[in-house]
């Protein structure tokens, strides 16, 4: 992870020792379940706050894998299946999300649940004021961000199959109670 000006880079590098997994088993799974054939290179992104994230390369194709971290976890934490389900549901809308490729809940494959999605090029801005771009580009970035937020707010969660997602009620109250 490095920052240059206001743009943050999560450039991939070697897989950290604590996050290594059976890459051959992953390649077999992806060939069988998603038709991704050929040699598979795995690198780990330097950033990420909760779930280890990896760049998968197979020929000219690139994908992102997100998996649960190792160790003891809160039962309701690190639910990569939820991430997958939400983005898969949003793919039915005009909200821009990467194409979901596969969800694997069989821990025998790489030791934990994971999902794979397409890799999309982009930039991550560390400073919300985005000082290193022109005024015009900054305005376009803010307009695009606001457009996507508006699209998210227009999503009818029932129409995209998320009516049974989560527990109704006060989410924040439950979180405060859990961590206090």
Each language-model region and where it sits:
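Short, Lys/Arg-enriched N-terminal segments with co-localized hydrophobic residues
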Residues: 1-7
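Juxta-kinase regulatory segment immediately upstream of eukaryotic protein kinase catalytic domains
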Residues: 8-40
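ATP-binding pocket architecture of kinase catalytic cores
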Residues: 39-180
